[in-house]
């Protein structure tokens, strides 16, 4: 039967094939490569080793709570948010220790589009380790050193190599980087 394509129906989306994480995975890899390019350009370091540190479980919980609060209540009032967070047993220690971290996370969240924020709310958990591991070959290719040593650690890893304590600067979707 010969039919014109213009008379055919549009294809339908198969939601089971769609991953909420895919856009964040790709953006995480792109941002990591871009950040490393900036660091090497400014410092004029030729990287031999690159260490990437992902945020702790507590920081991820804090991020999720901030994201929910900002999206549901449409407010990012730092004082109001801090009062709530210091009473949350799950995250109060990190909040009291580092109010600047809370401020930076709020800025991170507000810098993203509403669509990105809404998608991230729907994601139960986002593991930065998997896309970062997948991005190592792209990073090596970009730098032009296929033998470049790249290690990825969680901030919580007790055996991580972190001579400058860079891991403490990691935030969800914003891994910390150390280059030798």
Model-flagged regions — what are they?
Residues 1-34, 53-56:
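Acidic, turn-prone loop/beta-hairpin segments
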Residues 29-49:
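Beta-strand-rich binding/interaction modules
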Residues 43-69, 100-103, 109-122:
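Short glycine-rich, basic-tinged beta-strand/loop micro-motifs
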Residues 23-27, 63-65, 126-130:
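Ordered, soluble secondary-structure elements with a strong preference for glycine-centered loop motifs
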Residues 14-19, 60-64, 159-166:
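Short, solvent-exposed polar/charged micro-motifs at secondary-structure junctions
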Residues 79-180:
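C-terminal edge-of-domain segments
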Residues 2, 45-51, 172-174:
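Active-site lining segments that contact anionic ligands and/or coordinate catalytic metals
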Residues 1-4, 65-74:
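Short secondary-structure boundary/capping segments
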